[in-house]
Amino acid sequence: MRINPTTSGPAVSTLEEKNLGRIAQIIGPVLDVVFPPGKMPNIYNALVVKGRDTVGQQINVTCEVQQLLGNNRVRAVAMSATDGLTRGMEVIDTGAPLSVPVGGATLGRIFNVLGEPVDNLGPVDTRTTSPIHRSAPAFIQLDTKLSIFETGIKVVDLLAPYRRGGKIGLFGGAGVGKTVLIMELINNIAKAHGGVSVFGGVSERTREGNDLYMEMKESGVINEKNIAESKVALVYGQMNEPPGARMRVGLTALTMAEYFRDVNEQDVLLFIDNIFRFVQAGSEVSALLGRMPSAVGYQPTLSTEMGTLQERITSTKEGSITSIQAVYVPADDLTDPAPATTFAHLDATTVLSRGLAAKGIYPAVDPLDSTSTMLQPRIVGEEHYETAQRVKQTLQRYKELQDIIAILGLDELSEEDRLTVARARKIERFLSQPFFVAEVFTGSPGKYVGLAETIRGFQLILSGELDGLPEQAFYLVGNIDEATAKAMNLEGESNLKK
């Protein structure tokens, strides 16, 4: 059964007299609390520790019950630093799970895992709150229609299109452009679709979170003059937070997104950067709770934790949540249990390649490794499907010929293979694109390319009509008309030099 949003948070004051416990043990972010007989809190209940530390500073720490140990003891994980806590301090059982503010009041604001604003812009309306632990929608509520979600990014829309209401994984190692791609998607979707986004910053760099916030203010996604007209709510649990906060911040963001879907009946975008850190935080908590580690040191409950989060991200008859999740791949190993478990839940994968990034091709999306369940003729149409397959065949043939080219050179190839290589190199460069959010770095204005324009461009390259143009004309341009204009400019420049 799904728990509906309430119009008030858990009333701590009314429960104070009923259910008080005391801290018995503190090990880092894990607390053991003793309660009176018969007054044990439930699993996932929020506990609050209030008081003063030894130097008189105010303490307010929220914890979440994870285990019932026996002898009237519970083990809880803290959502903030446990500095200053001492044994014997009073602990209040709130009698309910963590609840966070939801609805229009969250737009344009930055929250922590507890739903508290951290942007110094004053309090948030907390009359409507929702618990972060909820069951997934029932089968009867789900929507099964298949439709494409256009992003305006050529390589994505053509070769690995996103499903509206689906789950998409951005796979890549460190420094290949996952966060930049997410920022571009937020920008494009807010401008082209007018949709509401929720961004969950799960254990990523504080600097990146700040950069993203500033970028959103500049691009108008967050409207400083009228904050209610903003298109995104931000929830951050950064690298410096305790593992409990990092493990739950994804659920806080998801709860906010669910309200927009279920109550406001909107199409929502949920960005999670980074889903691997959610698993990593779960692994830390699992070890702190004394569970036996599983493969590669991960928690034994890895599949369950991932499934609980992912099954709530879905389309219902009221609205949809389309989720785009950055997935850090440890040591670029896709067989690691964390990315491998994530794969099972995804409708599309966008794999970022270090090789393409080294060549300067951005977005560095690997056109052969990236996949989508949507790339079927009955969903995208014959023209799109045929063009995508021919692009992949051309790039695959080029990949096969690279060893021969490296040893013998281009001249030893047949005429047909030389033509394939020339077209593949044009396609590879045409898959690059200037981003709006990267304008300050590249100096090139960003481009949003519609799906029809994308298909037309690749059809022209494959047909051989543009064989006479130099390959550098296709690098970092929007549609195919820009490439032909760039080729004319390059030709004019070379004539001037002569």
Swiss-Prot record:
Per UniProt, what is the membrane topology?
Peripheral membrane protein
* Localisation per UniProt entry: Plastid, Chloroplast thylakoid membrane
Supply the SMART domains for this chain.
AAA
| Cellular component per GO, a single term | mitochondrion
SUPFAM superfamilies documented for this protein: C-terminal domain of alpha and beta subunits of F1 ATP synthase, N-terminal domain of alpha and beta subunits of F1 ATP synthase, P-loop containing nucleoside triphosphate hydrolases
- Keyword terms: ATP synthesis, ATP-binding, CF(1), Chloroplast, Hydrogen ion transport, Ion transport, Membrane, Nucleotide-binding, Plastid, Thylakoid, Translocase, Transport
Point out the coiled-coil segments of this chain.
none
Q: Does the keyword Transport apply?
A: yes
Question: Which GO biological process entries does UniProt record here?
Answer: proton motive force-driven mitochondrial ATP synthesis
Q: Which EC number applies?
A: 7.1.2.2
Q: Which cysteines are joined by disulfide bonds?
A: none
Q: Which reaction does it catalyse?
A: ATP + H2O + 4 H(+)(in) = ADP + phosphate + 5 H(+)(out)
Which terms does the record give in the GO molecular function aspect? ATP binding; ATP hydrolysis activity; proton-transporting ATP synthase activity, rotational mechanism
Provide the residue positions that the database annotates as binding ATP: G172, G173, A174, G175, V176, G177, K178, T179
Per the record, the similarity remark reads: Belongs to the ATPase alpha/beta chains family.
Q: Entry's PANTHER family?
A: ATP SYNTHASE (PTHR15184), ATP SYNTHASE SUBUNIT BETA, MITOCHONDRIAL (PTHR15184:SF71)
- Assembly mode: F-type ATPases have 2 components, CF(1) - the catalytic core - and CF(0) - the membrane proton channel. CF(1) has five subunits: alpha(3), beta(3), gamma(1), delta(1), epsilon(1). CF(0) has four main subunits: a(1), b(1), b'(1) and c(9-12).
Q: In its UniProt entry, what is this protein called?
A: ATP synthase subunit beta, chloroplastic
